[in-house]
UniProtKB/Swiss-Prot annotation:
InterPro entries attached to this UniProt entry: Allrgn_V5/Tpx1_CS (IPR018244), CAP_dom (IPR014044), CAP_sf (IPR035940), CRISP-related (IPR001283), SCP_GLIPR-1-like (IPR034121), V5_allergen-like (IPR002413)
Summary of the function given for this chain in its UniProt record: Required for optimal fertilization at the stage of sperm-oocyte fusion, plays a role in optimizing acrosome function, the translocation of IZUMO1 during the acrosome reaction and the fertilization process. Component of epididymosomes, one type of membranous microvesicules which mediate the transfer of lipids and proteins to spermatozoa plasma membrane during epididymal maturation. Also a component of the CD9-positive microvesicules found in the cauda region.
Positions of the propeptide removed during maturation: 221-241
Protein name: GLIPR1-like protein 1
Gene that this sequence comes from: GLIPR1L1
Keywords recorded for this protein, A-Z: Cell membrane, Cytoplasmic vesicle, Fertilization, Glycoprotein, GPI-anchor, Lipoprotein, Membrane, Signal
Domain SCP: 39-172
Organism per entry: Bos taurus (Bovine)
Length: 241
């Protein structure tokens, strides 16, 4: 029994040592620099749409969407989350959420590369006819006027390619990309703001842009059982010896 227990501790220690040699960590969903970059790139894309938008809302960060993105990214599956088609499964207050995915190396700025790549799809999209010659869905979601909340997350996924492969997931609410609809209304910037202020061609509203906390939102349904930190490793070694 004692031997079995020691072997169990050694197995745990081995897992932690392996984890300690993993690729560089992906940015956290609470990392201010990561959040700022995601918001800046999304809003720059929305500001610069052509033709100009009369009703383009400023996009602000949403904690619950980021948690959902993080939970899905950590599964390391390069497919869309099924929650996006299920009522209130991606977010506690928004009925549906949109989603964009990107897969690439973690060695570059995942958010910058991904969002710029999504925005570049505009060259395949004809606004007047709502037609697309190649892939445009990422672009239309990024500039969907009434999607005003976003939450993104990055996870390292060696199983999807190389040891530094990273999966970036961005969730949007309210969801965009509805069939037979334009992503926004063409017109003088902010002319359809309806009481909002206008900033960089985007409709802003302090109440709508406010960041909310969702402490009870746990889309993954799981908790981390082992914390592989130095103090934990020391306690394991002391227990064994």
């Amino acid at each position: 029994m004692i031997l079995r227990k020691k072997l169990s501790y050694l197995w745990t220690l081995g897992l932690c040592l392996v984890a300690s040699k993993s690729p560089p960590k992906a940015p956290s969903i609470t990392n201010d620099r990561f959040i700022e970059e995601c918001l800046r790139l999304h809003n720059e894309a929305r500001t610069n749409v052509s033709p100009p938008a009369a009703d383009m809302k400023y996009m602000s960060w949403d904690e619950a969407l980021a948690k959902t993105a993080e939970a899905w990214a950590k599964k390391c599956k390069f497919i869309h989350n099924s929650c996006s088609s299920k009522s209130f499964k991606c977010h506690p207050t928004f009925q549906y959420a949109g989603e964009n995915l990107w897969l690439g190396p973690l060695t570059i700025s995942a958010a910058k590369f991904a969002i710029n790549m999504w925005y570049d799809e505009r060259k395949f999209y004809d606004f007047n006819t709502r037609s697309c010659s190649q892939v445009c869905g990422h672009y239309t979601q990024v500039v969907w006027a009434y999607s005003y909340k976003v939450g993104c997350a990055v996870a390292v996924c060696p199983n999807l390619g190389s040891p530094d492969s990273a999966l970036l997931v961005c969730n949007y609410a309210p969801a965009g990309n509805y069939p037979n609809m334009s992503p926004y209304t063409n017109g003088t910037p902010c002319s359809m703001c309806q009481g909002d202020t206008c900033e960089n061609n985007l409709c802003r509203n302090k109440e709508r842009d406010k960041s909310q906390r969702y402490p009870n939102w746990n889309p993954s349904g799981t908790r981390q059982l082992i914390a592989c930190n130095p103090l934990y490793l020391i306690s394991v070694l002391l227990t064994i010896f």
